[in-house]
Amino acid sequence: MPGPVDTAKSITKKRKRKHGGNGRATAETADDASPLPAAENGAVTESSAKKEVKADKKSGKEKEKALKKRKVSHSSSDEEEEEEDDEAATSGPVDEASDDEAEVEEDGSDNEDGDAEDKNDAEAADLPSMDAVRLPTVDGEPQKFTELGLSEKTLKAINEMGFETMTEIQRRTIPPLLAGRDVLGAAKTGSGKTLSFLIPAVEMLSALRFKPRNGTGVLVVSPTRELALQIFGVARELCQHHSQTYGIVIGGANRRAEAEKLMKGVNLLIATPGRLLDHLQNTQGFVFKNLKTLVIDEADRILEVGFEDEMRQIVKILPSEERQTMLFSATQTTKVEDLARISLRPGPLYINVDHRKEHSTVEGLEQGYVICEADKRFLLLFSFLKRNLKKKIIVFFSSCNCVKYHAELLNYIDLPVLELHGKQKQQKRTNTFFEFCNAKQGTLICTDVAARGLDIPAVDWIIQFDPPDDPRDYIHRVGRTARGANAKGRSLMFLQPSEVGFLKHLKEARVPVVEFEFPASKIVNVQSQLEKLIGQNYYLNKSAKEGYRSYLQAYASHSLRSVFDVHKLDLVKVAKGFGFSTPPRIDIQLGASLSRDKKQQQQGRRNYGSQPNGKGLKFKRKYED
C-alpha cells in the first residue's frame, strides 16, 4: 500500500531535482522573497580594520533597508490578498478560514534549506495511511446520525444543521462509505444524497489529519455551477468545526483567484468538469497527488451535457491507487456504466433506493397536465401567475431565448419574475439563484440549468411550459418541489393536442399524472393588447422573434420525434403565443443535421422514443454547465 501522504513541499523538492531551478509553478510573492544579504556578506575580502568598520556601517544600513522593505512587502502582500479575496467572493466563494490556514502553511515553507525540508517530510510521515485509519463501523441499518459513531465535530455540525434522522439513501450508503467501499448509488432527486457523500468524506479528511499543504484529499464533481454552489454551502456547514479547508472552482469564476487558493491548499474541493480539467492541466501548484476520495454527482447529467471526454480525462489524470470513488446517478445509462467501469474499483456496492417504489416521483407531489392550443398557452400562463402572486413558482422553458423574451415581457407588463439561464454571466446566475432561494414568494423562469439537484426551499408549483425532452427530464424538473420529509408540492405541464402521446411515456416511467381543467372564464384574454405591444415595441419585437426561432429549433431537436414533431405544429398559433398576428419571417433551415452536442446527448439516452434520423433544424447548444 502507498506510504504517507505527500506534501506540497516534497513535490516541489522533486520538481527541483527533475527540472532544476526553484521548482515552483508561479512567481514568488513579496512574502516569499528572501531577505537582503547579512553583514558578513558585505566585505569578505577586506583586511584593514578601517574597511571592516565601513563594512559594518554599510551592513547596518542594509539591514535597516531590508527591514523596511520587508514591512512594505508584508503590507502590499496583505493588500493583494484582500483584493483577491474580494475577487473570489464575487466569482465563486472559497472558505475564508482556508486562506488563513494556507497562509500559515506557505509561510512555514519559505525556508529552502535541507533542515526545513526534512522537518516537513517528518511531519508528513506522521500522517497515517488509509490502512492505519479506523473510521467508524456500523452494525445493521442505523436510523439516526448519532448511531454512526461519527466524530463530535461532525455530529455537532449535523445537529446545528437541524438533522437528526437519516433518509433511506443516507442509511444505506453512509455505513459502507465509512468502511471504504466504492458505491454506485441511484436515488430520486431530493433524497438527501449530498450528506450521504459529504459526511464520509469529511470524516476521512479529519481522521487523516489533512492540512492545506497536503493538497486536495476529496474532490466532488458536479454538472452545473448552481449545484456546485449548493454542495459547497452544505460542505461549509458540515466543516465549520473542522480545521480542514474547502473551496470551489466553477466556470465563469475568476480563474486566477481560484488558482491562488488551490496553490495554498484546498482539502475538500467542489468543481464543475470543464474548470476542474483546466486546473488539473494548467495549475502546476495544484496538489492532488494525495487524493483519497472522488465523488461524481449527477453522473448521467454530466454525460448528457457533453462532458464525457472531460470526465474520461479527469479520471485518467487523478491518482487511482487507494482512491475511494462514489458515483451517484438518477438513471443508469450505458455511458454511466462505462464511466463507472473506468472510475470504480472492482466489486463496487450498487445501491438503488427507488426500484421498489410504486412511483418514480416523490410522495406528497400532486402532478397534473393541461391540454392547451398553442395560441392560448401564454394567456393561460399569464392568468395562472397573476392568480398565484403569493406562491413560489418555477417555470421551465426549452431555450435561453424563450426565457429572456418571457422575462422581459412579464416584467414589462408588471408581473415581476426572475430569470435563470446559461447565457447569463456567472455572477448574475449566482445572485438570482440565492435571491430566489431566500424569497418566500415569487416566480423564477428558467431553462433546464435549474432542473437537476438544486435544493430550493418551499417551492409551491413547478410549471413545465415547454415539454421536457423525456420522462427523466420531467422527473428532475418536478423534483424541485416536495423536497424533504412530508413535504408537499404541485406540478403542471402544458401539452398541445398533438403532444398527448407523451402521457404514455410518463405512464411507462411510473409517473402518475391527472388532467387539470381551467375554465375559459378564468383565463384573461390579453391577446389583442399583447399583439399591439409586440408590434410597437422594437426591443420586445426583436426578443419575441429570437424566442420564437429558438422554440422551433428546440422543438425540432426533441428526442421523442414520434410525439414532438415540428412538422405538426400550427405555426400561426405558435406565433400568436409569442405575440405575433402572423408568423414572422425567420431564417431556419429544415433538413439540417443536429449539432454535435445534441447528438451526444441523444446517444446517451434510453430508447424512450424514435431515435434521431438526421432530419431537424440547426440550433444552438440547449444545455449549459
Swiss-Prot record:
Residues 174-350 form the Helicase ATP-binding domain. ATP binds at residues 187-194. It catalyses: ATP + H2O = ADP + phosphate + H(+). PROSITE patterns: DEAD_ATP_HELICASE, HELICASE_ATP_BIND_1, HELICASE_CTER, Q_MOTIF. Its EC number is 3.6.4.13. Pfam families: CTE_SPB4, DEAD, Helicase_C. A motif (Q motif) lies at residues 143-171. It is an enzyme of class 3 (hydrolase). Keywords: ATP-binding, Helicase, Hydrolase, Nucleotide-binding, Nucleus, Ribosome biogenesis, RNA-binding, rRNA processing. Residues 601-613 have a biased composition (Polar residues). One of its GO terms (molecular function) is ATP hydrolysis activity. InterPro entries: DDX18/Has1_DEADc, DEAD/DEAH_box_helicase_dom, Helicase_ATP-bd, Helicase_C-like, P-loop_NTPase, RNA-helicase_DEAD-box_CS, RNA_helicase_DEAD_Q_motif, SPB4-like_CTE. Residues 11-21 have a biased composition (Basic residues). Associates in the nucleolus with the 60S and pre-60S ribosomal subunits. Belongs to the DEAD box helicase family. DDX18/HAS1 subfamily. ATP-dependent RNA helicase involved in 40S ribosomal subunit biogenesis. Required for the processing and cleavage of 35S pre-rRNA at sites A0, A1, and A2, leading to mature 18S rRNA. This is ATP-dependent RNA helicase has1. It comes from Aspergillus clavatus (strain ATCC 1007 / CBS 513.65 / DSM 816 / NCTC 3887 / NRRL 1 / QM 1276 / 107). The lineage of its organism: Eukaryota, Fungi, Dikarya, Ascomycota, Pezizomycotina. The gene is has1.
